[in-house]
């Protein structure tokens, strides 16, 4: 990724839904489809979106926007966000519906009630403001129905956190600023927080934060946890632990591969390879404390990878030592006596090589 060239920002599903809803509302109330259609976002930005779909019939109008996530590897990039507007029941106000490809909330703990379409609060507000302004121009009450649909959203949702959060049937319509920042950590950390919120609301007493799929399989087998108890922590150990400090769950397991857990053991809370590295000299010192001879310690300090050190350390309980130190480092950040913390370290085959309580 070239440093000299800024990454291109994109637009959230919420921004696209707002633009589609505004265009459809204009058409429904007799103004025709604006193309492009401009919207007002929090923070003052006023993007305009080209319509990918514009159709209407008796009592309804429909508009679609193709989501452009910029240079972010967003799974919803290229999806068409469609809003269908209909006249509602007099006095009922604005009603949101989930069309095909948009999920329904089935578990408590999210900022939406169970049974509601997975259209988050900020996109709801932006859509409500946009259509209310159009209705007011026509001297009408805002008794309208907004249905959001996403063709293929059911399949896209399987590549998101939604099934684990209990959002079923499609994707969520998301966004707080309307803007997608490429490779931003905030979206992942937000998903971690929502996973913890749902676990707490469902009364779970044990969850596991996993670095990836290998550690997830291991922790589910060893700890006997169901899918609903798994938090996709990824590289954001610190983000998860800090949120758990304020929103505790009785028991938490952290599970990850040897290299990532070496970073955690050394006190690094961001485990991404571009933002933290395994300190080989520190790792060699752990081997020395386990009784390794000078030659092995020296070879370990010169190793290129943590995996190489693990192979050199055959016969020494290095995985267990790393698990203990990772638990101590995580415990310090967690800083909440209400939470029981343990750490699992796995090798590349998913075998547990360290388990510290």
UniProtKB/Swiss-Prot annotation:
Record-listed E.C. numbers: 2.1.1.195
Reactions the enzyme catalyzes: Co-precorrin-5B + S-adenosyl-L-methionine = Co-precorrin-6A + S-adenosyl-L-homocysteine
One annotated GO biological process: anaerobic cobalamin biosynthetic process
GO molecular function: cobalt-precorrin-5B C1-methyltransferase activity
Pathway per the UniProt entry: Cofactor biosynthesis; adenosylcobalamin biosynthesis; cob(II)yrinate a,c-diamide from sirohydrochlorin (anaerobic route): step 6/10
Enzyme class, spelled out: transferase
Coiled coil, from the record: none
Keywords recorded for this protein, A-Z: Cobalamin biosynthesis, Methyltransferase, S-adenosyl-L-methionine, Transferase
Family under the similarity heading: Belongs to the CbiD family.
Protein name listed in UniProt: Cobalt-precorrin-5B C(1)-methyltransferase
Source organism of this protein record: Paramagnetospirillum magneticum (strain ATCC 700264 / AMB-1)
Taxon lineage: Bacteria, Pseudomonadati, Pseudomonadota, Alphaproteobacteria, Rhodospirillales
């Amino acid at each position: 990724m070239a440093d000299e060239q800024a990454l291109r920002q994109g637009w959230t599903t919420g921004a696209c839904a707002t633009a589609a809803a505004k265009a459809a509302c204009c058409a429904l109330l007799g103004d025709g489809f604006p193309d492009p259609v401009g919207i007002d976002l929090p923070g003052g930005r006023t993007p305009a979106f080209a319509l990918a779909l514009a159709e209407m019939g008796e009592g309804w109008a429909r508009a679609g926007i193709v989501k452009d996530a910029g240079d972010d590897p967003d799974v919803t990039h290229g999806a068409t966000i469609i809003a269908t507007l209909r006249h509602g029941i007099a006095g009922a106000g604005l009603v949101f519906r989930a069309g095909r490809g948009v999920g329904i909330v089935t578990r408590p703990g999210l900022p939406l009630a169970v049974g509601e379409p997975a259209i988050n609060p900020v996109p709801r507000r932006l859509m409500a403001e946009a259509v209310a302004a159009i209705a007011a121009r026509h001297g009408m009450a805002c008794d309208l129905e907004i249905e959001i649909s996403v063709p293929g959203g059911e399949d896209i949702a399987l590549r998101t956190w939604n099934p684990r959060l209990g959002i079923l049937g499609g994707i969520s319509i998301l966004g707080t600023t309307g803007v997608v920042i490429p490779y931003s950590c905030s979206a992942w950390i937000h998903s971690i927080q929502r996973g913890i919120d749902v676990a707490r609301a469902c009364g779970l007493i044990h969850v596991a934060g996993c670095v990836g799929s290998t550690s997830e399989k291991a922790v589910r087998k060893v700890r006997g946890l169901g899918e609903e108890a798994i938090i996709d922590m990824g590289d954001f150990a610190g983000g998860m632990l800090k949120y758990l400090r304020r929103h505790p769950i009785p028991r938490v397991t952290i599970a990850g591969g040897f290299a990532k857990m070496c970073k955690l053991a050394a006190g690094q809370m961001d485990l991404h390879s571009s933002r933290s590295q395994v300190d080989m000299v520190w790792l060699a010192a752990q081997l020395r404390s386990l009784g390794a001879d000078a030659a092995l310690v020296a070879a370990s300090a010169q190793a290129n990878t943590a995996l190489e050190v693990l192979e050199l350390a055959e016969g020494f309980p290095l995985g267990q030592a790393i698990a203990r130190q990772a638990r101590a480092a995580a415990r310090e950040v967690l800083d909440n006596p209400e939470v029981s913390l343990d750490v699992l370290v796995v090798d590349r085959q998913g075998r547990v090589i360290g388990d510290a309580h």
